[in-house]
């Protein structure tokens, strides 16, 4: 820290009582200066020789009845008694030390006392300006300290432009080439630096942690000045906002709903809304994770609708960067669910809107498809997780969210299957119709062999879906290698679907009869049907690895599914009776 010493005489100020200060000298005092609740017994000559304001006040002063000294009251001097005492010592030529912590108070007090060059050469205002310009404002940390102290001395600090000069100094240094930074700064994130940067390198965001010490209004002014001057990348501005939020917002890293103090809530709400307004417009300036943390905090602190909409829009632009944990946003108290599912639905809608806009601008299809694939994977994982923890999640809401990404490209539907399976597992009380509707979200042709193996043994899935999976697995096994695994090109898709409908028609009769049987009979019936289905689908595979499935074009009756050469047998009739 820079400092400056003024004067050479020893300090002879002493205290008589708690609120009385005087100069220990043989010469009797002849003026009493009252500053707040402190009385200073001083001498007119050294004071009046340097202060134009005291000259004016002494002309209209009253006399102290006890000491016959003239009495001056200056209750509104910036900095109060401590600042006035430094100014008085300067008038006496006594040694005083100035630094970044007291320079604002003394500079404003000197301005108040009108200690200008017109009164005496080398007066206090001049010396303070020399110290500020040659030392304080050239120091990174001193400039920040001075800027912080200016708040307590408005409007005087503003009148002498101390705040503006500090802002300019800080912005100039922040925009400087990091290679030229040769002063100390606070940086506790070095472990996050890329491996190619050694410990001696200065990171481009070297300044952001020091600015996190500022109040939000000063921080906003500094960042605005930095952006106006240019030379700092939007990504670094975004990093500064994230570091500031992490330091200043309680529970920012982990969503916190414990907000009992209304005054604190209002303060944090204002801070959040200010940070949102400061977000750079560039898409890559802030991470999706940071935006989601802001959104979570805005829910906790009940920020305005405008801020939430802006955050949702920004998140929608880069939703593919999020992870499942990011989307677990706690709902306001009193809701049906623990987590806010509606807000996730809004984020998906925003993503869809943004991709449509990119399509209109003829953006690369590969980029859009890649983003959609990532979002589809994200939402599949989210649905699986939210199904696990939300017992009140409705089938309608589950399907609504899943359908929003149903047309997005996927390498497989394993994620969709896992989400459906978890939903059925955690919500056993849903109706058969709801099970059927939710299961339709999955394309059985796009399941991996591992997922198929799990699904065919999954008792939670409707039997019709299990039959479809078995059928398409058989088709996949018998299709020539040159054809797509899903068998979904041209007329082959129509034929496959018709054949599958014939196979799955078996389940219709089974389901009807199942409703009339006991629990044990249901299990037995399903086992018989499943055994029969396996037999029908894999007969061909046992014979030279090729199966032949024929079906009626119109009938969905159980008898419409036969293998070549298969005839009605007593066992067949027994299966139908059991089903």
UniProtKB/Swiss-Prot annotation:
Recorded GO CC terms: cell periphery; cytosol; plasma membrane
Record's keyword terms, sorted: Cell membrane, Cytoplasm, Membrane, Phosphoprotein, Ubl conjugation pathway
Superkingdom in the source lineage: Eukaryota
Phosphotyrosine carried by residues: 417
GO biological process, one term: positive regulation of flower development
Basic and acidic residues bias spans: 513-524
A Pfam short name: NPH3
Span list, region Disordered: 479-526, 540-579
InterPro entries, alphabetized: BTB/POZ_dom, NPH3/RPT2-like, NPH3_dom, SKP1/BTB/POZ_sf
Pathway: Protein modification; protein ubiquitination
Family: Belongs to the NPH3 family.
Function: May act as a substrate-specific adapter of an E3 ubiquitin-protein ligase complex (CUL3-RBX1-BTB) which mediates the ubiquitination and subsequent proteasomal degradation of target proteins. Regulates basipetal PIN proteins (e.g. PIN1) polarization to establish inward auxin transport from the L1 surface of incipient organ primordia; this process is essential for the progression of flower organs development. Recruited to the plasma membrane by PINs (e.g. PIN1 and PIN2) and, in concert with AGC kinases-mediated (e.g.
Name recorded for this polypeptide: Phototropic-responsive NPH3 family protein NPY3
Species this protein is from: Arabidopsis thaliana
